[in-house]
Curated annotation (Swiss-Prot):
Residues that coordinate or bind gamma-L-glutamyl-L-cysteine: 82-85, 408, 412
Functional pathway: Amino-acid biosynthesis; ergothioneine biosynthesis
HAMAP family registered for this protein in UniProt: EgtB
Protein name (database record): Hercynine oxygenase
Enzyme class: oxidoreductase
């Protein structure tokens, strides 16, 4: 299990990041930048409410909490849609901050009192929850119009543009998909259990698809020719009037990013594209999207040892030597920027930079057992979702691993999602 000291460090890091993302005036925190997203003050108090529920009340909503039941109910994500939250009588920013601080103080006391052989998983789950909401808040801030509020605090390494458009072979055969709690104590229920699957050989993009490659798709009429699109995807493209990735400006040479207007870097992974756009691009490129099983094999499997790697590059914890994570750069790195982070098959940038769409719907692995927070995965199995893998530049290193499964509706574009191609052989 993760040590109490490590958990305390991860809790502190997550909270410091959260507070940076709400370090604005009350008007900013209480407004809604887009109906797709919550007001930031809702996310802030929801983070505290979930921490209180799981770390101080054992997950029992019937046990009295720090907030009156009617107020606590405002932060139930299943009861109140994102679009409706701006109309709720939410805690003020000052009260939300104070509430989160009170909860955190008690949570640290609970962590300090945890027996040496105590189950620390619930702390890891809460850390994951806060970090995931931090990425959601970054999505909201990117939808905001007006002068910039955020600035990058970390520079990116140079890339190797010649890597764009190249592919690597992933050998066929069995591999271990998923993880067990014994090997990854912080893994969530939909990542478990580990089980052997057989995957035929295929090729996968060495790096994600770039903005420059996507511009070629646009210039070739990719958004105007139905032959590249699925029937549902084409219907959505027409309804939504899609002509380029979200945030690209007319003409496709500039974009907006967190309030900045800038030239579009040709060698940067494309982001803010939907699953429908991703599958259309893949068809145009004479390729396809990978399944999530293929993706995980390309990311984690080492055929030389016949075993999984903890990370694509090995066992070392994620740092900026290996991947662009942690939200400090506010953008993906150019392709080829992290050769040290390559997987055993030679695929690069599989963790960080952009989430990558797969063709897979969200399903439980055989032998799935829900974790203590049963509503994390189960309500979404079988729904209208596609799985995304790999994380983005906005994901905290503490929660990302090759087995981590994200999911969203196939039409979503505000997420930091891009594309990696695959080919049959």
């Amino acid at each position: 299990m993760t040590s109490p000291e490590q958990l305390a460090c991860h809790l502190a890091r997550a909270r410091a990041r959260t507070l940076r993302l709400v370090d604005f005036d009350d008007a900013e925190l209480c407004c809604q930048y887009d109906p797709l997203m919550s007001p930031l003050v809702w996310d802030l108090a929801h983070i505290g409410q979930q921490e209180e529920l799981w770390l101080l009340r054992g997950g029992d909503p019937g046990q009295p909490g720090l907030l009156p039941p009617a107020v606590e109910g405002l932060y139930d994500a299943f009861e109140h849609s994102r679009a409706s939250r701006v109309e709720l009588p939410l805690l003020s920013p000052a009260r939300a901050r104070s509430y989160c601080a009170t909860v955190r103080s008690a949570a640290l006391d609970a962590l300090a009192a945890l027996p040496e052989d105590g189950d620390s998983f619930v702390f890891a789950m809460v850390i994951s929850h806060e970090n995931q909401h931090d990425e959601t808040m970054l999505q909201a801030l990117n939808l905001r119009t007006g002068s910039p509020l955020l600035a990058a605090t970390s520079a990116l390494p140079a890339g190797r543009p010649r890597m764009a458009g190249t592919s690597v072979l992933v050998a066929g055969g069995p591999f271990v998909l998923g993880v067990d709690a014994a090997d990854e104590p912080c893994s969530l229920d939909n990542e478990r259990p580990a089980h052997v699957v057989d995957v035929p050989a295929f090729r996968i993009g060495r790096v994600p698809v770039t903005n420059g490659e996507w511009q070629d798709f646009i210039d070739d009429g990719g958004y105007t020719q139905s032959r590249w699109w699925s029937e549902r995807g084409w219907q959505h493209r027409q309804r939504a009037g899609l002509t380029a990735p979200q945030f690209w400006r007319s003409g496709g040479r500039t974009r907006t990013r967190f309030g900045h207007v800038e030239d579009i870097p040709a060698d940067e992974p494309v982001q803010h594209v939907s699953y429908f756009e991703a599958e259309a691009y893949a068809a145009w490129a004479g390729a396809r999207l990978p399944t999530e099983v293929e993706w995980e094999k390309a990311c984690a499997w080492d055929p030389a040892t016949g075993s999984r790697r903890r990370y694509p590059w090995g066992t070392e914890e994620p740092t900026d030597t290996y991947a662009n994570l942690g939200g400090q750069t506010l953008r993906p790195a150019p392709v080829g920027a992290y050769p040290a982070g390559a997987s055993a098959c030679g695929a690069e940038q599989m963790l960080g930079d952009v989430w990558e769409w797969t063709t897979s719907p969200l399903r439980p692995w055989p032998g799935f057992v829900p974790m203590v927070y049963e509503r994390y995965s189960q309500p979404f199995f079988g729904g209208d979702y596609r799985v995304l893998r790999g994380g983005s530049w906005a994901v905290e290193p503490a929660i990302l691993r090759p087995s981590f499964r994200n999911w969203d509706h196939p039409y979503r574009r505000q997420i930091f999602a891009g594309v990696r191609l695959a080919w049959d052989i």
